Protein backbone atom coordinates (compact mmCIF):
# COMPACT_ATOMS: atom_id res chain seq x y z
CA UNK A 1 0.00 0.00 0.00
CA UNK A 2 1.16 3.49 -0.83
CA UNK A 3 1.22 5.82 2.19
CA UNK A 4 0.05 9.44 1.86
CA UNK A 5 3.09 11.64 1.25
CA UNK A 6 3.25 13.27 4.73
CA UNK A 7 3.35 9.86 6.44
CA UNK A 8 5.79 8.45 3.87
CA UNK A 9 8.12 11.43 4.50
CA UNK A 10 7.86 10.95 8.28
CA UNK A 11 8.62 7.23 7.97
CA UNK A 12 11.62 8.12 5.79
CA UNK A 13 12.78 10.58 8.44
CA UNK A 14 12.53 8.05 11.27
CA UNK A 15 14.43 5.46 9.18
CA UNK A 16 17.43 7.80 9.11
CA UNK A 17 17.83 7.24 12.85
CA UNK A 18 20.19 4.43 13.93
CA UNK A 19 18.50 1.11 14.65
CA UNK A 20 15.14 2.16 13.17
CA UNK A 21 13.92 -0.07 10.36
CA UNK A 22 10.82 0.28 8.18
CA UNK A 23 8.43 -1.42 10.65
CA UNK A 24 9.51 0.63 13.66
CA UNK A 25 9.55 3.82 11.57
CA UNK A 26 6.01 3.09 10.42
CA UNK A 27 4.84 2.44 14.01
CA UNK A 28 6.43 5.71 15.17
CA UNK A 29 4.88 7.68 12.31
CA UNK A 30 1.41 6.36 13.11
CA UNK A 31 1.99 7.06 16.81
CA UNK A 32 2.81 10.69 15.94
CA UNK A 33 -0.38 10.82 13.87
CA UNK A 34 -2.39 9.89 17.00
CA UNK A 35 -0.61 12.42 19.28
CA UNK A 36 -2.22 15.69 20.34
CA UNK A 37 -1.18 18.56 18.09
CA UNK A 38 0.48 20.45 21.00
CA UNK A 39 2.60 17.39 21.82
CA UNK A 40 3.65 17.04 18.18
CA UNK A 41 4.59 20.73 18.05
CA UNK A 42 6.62 20.39 21.29
CA UNK A 43 8.38 17.34 19.83
CA UNK A 44 9.14 19.16 16.57
CA UNK A 45 10.40 22.20 18.50
CA UNK A 46 12.69 19.97 20.61
CA UNK A 47 14.18 18.46 17.43
CA UNK A 48 14.80 21.90 15.92
CA UNK A 49 16.28 23.25 19.17
CA UNK A 50 18.79 20.40 19.37
CA UNK A 51 20.21 21.52 16.03
CA UNK A 52 19.92 25.27 16.57
CA UNK A 53 20.88 25.71 20.22
CA UNK A 54 23.55 23.08 20.82
CA UNK A 55 27.17 23.37 19.78
CA UNK A 56 30.49 21.81 20.75
CA UNK A 57 32.60 23.24 23.56
CA UNK A 58 35.69 24.95 22.16
CA UNK A 59 37.79 23.45 24.99
CA UNK A 60 36.68 19.83 25.50
CA UNK A 61 34.41 19.32 22.44
CA UNK A 62 31.46 18.09 24.52
CA UNK A 63 27.95 19.10 23.44
CA UNK A 64 26.82 22.29 25.13
CA UNK A 65 24.47 25.23 25.00
CA UNK A 66 27.21 27.54 26.38
CA UNK A 67 30.82 27.94 25.28
CA UNK A 68 32.91 26.91 27.12
CA UNK A 69 30.66 24.22 28.59
CA UNK A 70 29.62 24.12 32.23
CA UNK A 71 32.12 21.36 33.05
CA UNK A 72 35.06 23.31 31.61
CA UNK A 73 33.88 26.46 33.44
CA UNK A 74 33.42 24.68 36.80
CA UNK A 75 36.27 25.84 39.07
CA UNK A 76 35.47 23.06 41.59
CA UNK A 77 36.55 20.37 39.12
CA UNK A 78 40.08 18.97 39.20
CA UNK A 79 41.95 20.66 36.35
CA UNK A 80 44.94 18.33 36.71
CA UNK A 81 43.05 15.32 35.29
CA UNK A 82 41.53 14.92 31.82
CA UNK A 83 39.35 11.93 30.97
CA UNK A 84 39.43 11.20 27.23
CA UNK A 85 36.23 9.67 25.82
CA UNK A 86 35.09 8.79 22.31
CA UNK A 87 31.69 10.49 22.24
CA UNK A 88 29.64 13.12 24.08
CA UNK A 89 27.30 10.33 25.25
CA UNK A 90 30.25 8.92 27.20
CA UNK A 91 30.57 12.15 29.22
CA UNK A 92 26.94 11.75 30.28
CA UNK A 93 27.60 8.13 31.29
CA UNK A 94 30.68 9.14 33.32
CA UNK A 95 28.84 12.00 35.03
CA UNK A 96 26.03 9.65 36.13
CA UNK A 97 28.40 7.78 38.45
CA UNK A 98 29.15 11.05 40.32
CA UNK A 99 32.68 9.94 41.24
CA UNK A 100 34.83 11.60 38.59
CA UNK A 101 35.54 15.28 39.25
CA UNK A 102 38.12 16.14 36.59
CA UNK A 103 37.72 17.57 33.11
CA UNK A 104 36.97 15.79 29.81
CA UNK A 105 38.15 15.65 26.23
CA UNK A 106 35.73 14.25 23.63
CA UNK A 107 37.42 12.72 20.57
CA UNK A 108 34.28 12.32 18.42
CA UNK A 109 35.37 8.90 17.25
CA UNK A 110 38.20 6.41 17.37
CA UNK A 111 41.11 5.55 15.13
CA UNK A 112 39.92 3.03 12.54
CA UNK A 113 42.24 2.47 9.55
CA UNK A 114 39.66 0.10 8.00
CA UNK A 115 37.20 3.01 7.87
CA UNK A 116 39.84 5.54 6.83
CA UNK A 117 39.76 7.32 10.21
CA UNK A 118 43.18 8.46 11.39
CA UNK A 119 44.28 10.49 14.44
CA UNK A 120 43.89 13.76 12.53
CA UNK A 121 40.22 12.92 11.80
CA UNK A 122 39.29 12.94 15.49
CA UNK A 123 40.16 15.45 18.23
CA UNK A 124 43.64 14.08 19.07
CA UNK A 125 45.56 17.17 17.84
CA UNK A 126 43.31 19.31 20.07
CA UNK A 127 44.06 16.99 23.01
CA UNK A 128 47.82 17.33 22.50
CA UNK A 129 47.43 21.11 22.41
CA UNK A 130 45.50 21.02 25.72
CA UNK A 131 48.24 18.95 27.34
CA UNK A 132 50.69 21.84 26.94
CA UNK A 133 49.00 23.32 30.03
CA UNK A 134 51.36 22.67 32.97
CA UNK A 135 48.50 21.95 35.39
CA UNK A 136 47.62 18.61 33.75
CA UNK A 137 49.12 15.64 35.60
CA UNK A 138 47.03 12.70 34.42
CA UNK A 139 45.18 11.61 31.29
CA UNK A 140 42.60 8.88 31.84
CA UNK A 141 41.85 7.13 28.55
CA UNK A 142 38.24 5.93 28.66
CA UNK A 143 37.73 4.90 25.04
CA UNK A 144 35.42 1.96 24.38
CA UNK A 145 36.89 -1.54 24.85
CA UNK A 146 36.79 -2.30 21.12
CA UNK A 147 39.65 -2.81 18.66
CA UNK A 148 39.30 0.82 17.56
CA UNK A 149 39.06 2.06 21.15
CA UNK A 150 42.18 0.11 22.15
CA UNK A 151 44.11 1.36 19.11
CA UNK A 152 43.14 4.92 20.02
CA UNK A 153 44.17 4.39 23.65
CA UNK A 154 47.59 3.04 22.65
CA UNK A 155 48.13 5.89 20.18
CA UNK A 156 47.29 8.50 22.83
CA UNK A 157 49.54 6.74 25.34
CA UNK A 158 52.51 6.81 22.93
CA UNK A 159 51.96 10.54 22.32
CA UNK A 160 51.46 11.55 25.95
CA UNK A 161 54.04 9.42 27.83
CA UNK A 162 57.10 11.37 26.59
CA UNK A 163 55.60 14.55 28.11
CA UNK A 164 55.86 13.07 31.62
CA UNK A 165 52.08 13.21 32.14
CA UNK A 166 50.70 10.03 33.74
CA UNK A 167 48.52 8.04 31.31
CA UNK A 168 45.99 5.54 32.69
CA UNK A 169 43.33 3.36 31.07
CA UNK A 170 40.02 2.55 32.73
CA UNK A 171 39.80 -1.09 33.82
CA UNK A 172 37.79 -3.57 31.84
CA UNK A 173 34.82 -3.97 34.09
CA UNK A 174 33.23 -3.03 30.80
CA UNK A 175 32.50 -5.79 28.32
CA UNK A 176 34.85 -6.00 25.36
CA UNK A 177 33.03 -4.68 22.33
CA UNK A 178 30.63 -2.65 24.50
CA UNK A 179 29.96 1.08 24.62
CA UNK A 180 30.36 3.30 27.69
CA UNK A 181 26.93 4.85 27.24
CA UNK A 182 25.25 1.48 28.00
CA UNK A 183 27.25 0.73 31.17
CA UNK A 184 25.59 1.19 34.54
CA UNK A 185 27.05 3.47 37.21
CA UNK A 186 28.49 0.62 39.35
CA UNK A 187 30.33 -0.94 36.39
CA UNK A 188 31.72 2.45 35.35
CA UNK A 189 32.74 3.22 38.92
CA UNK A 190 34.64 -0.09 39.21
CA UNK A 191 36.27 0.50 35.84
CA UNK A 192 37.50 3.91 37.00
CA UNK A 193 38.81 2.48 40.30
CA UNK A 194 40.71 -0.24 38.45
CA UNK A 195 42.26 1.99 35.81
CA UNK A 196 45.86 1.16 34.98
CA UNK A 197 48.84 3.04 33.68
CA UNK A 198 49.48 2.69 29.95
Curated annotation (Swiss-Prot):
Alphabetical list of InterPro entries matching this protein: DNA_Rcmb_RecR (IPR000093), Rcmb_RecR (IPR023627), Rcmb_RecR_Znf (IPR015967), TOPRIM_dom (IPR006171), TOPRIM_RecR (IPR034137)
UniProt organism field: Halalkalibacterium halodurans (strain ATCC BAA-125 / DSM 18197 / FERM 7344 / JCM 9153 / C-125)
Biological-process GO terms, alphabetical: DNA recombination; DNA repair
Family: Belongs to the RecR family.
ZnF segments: C4-type: 57-72
Biological role: May play a role in DNA repair. It seems to be involved in an RecBC-independent recombinational process of DNA repair. It may act with RecF and RecO.
Protein name stated in the entry: Recombination protein RecR
Lineage start: Bacteria, Bacillati, Bacillota, Bacilli, Bacillales
Segments forming domain Toprim: 80-175
Domain of life: Bacteria
Keywords, comma-separated and alphabetical: DNA damage, DNA recombination, DNA repair, Metal-binding, Zinc, Zinc-finger
GO molecular function: DNA binding; zinc ion binding
HAMAP family linked: RecR (MF_00017)
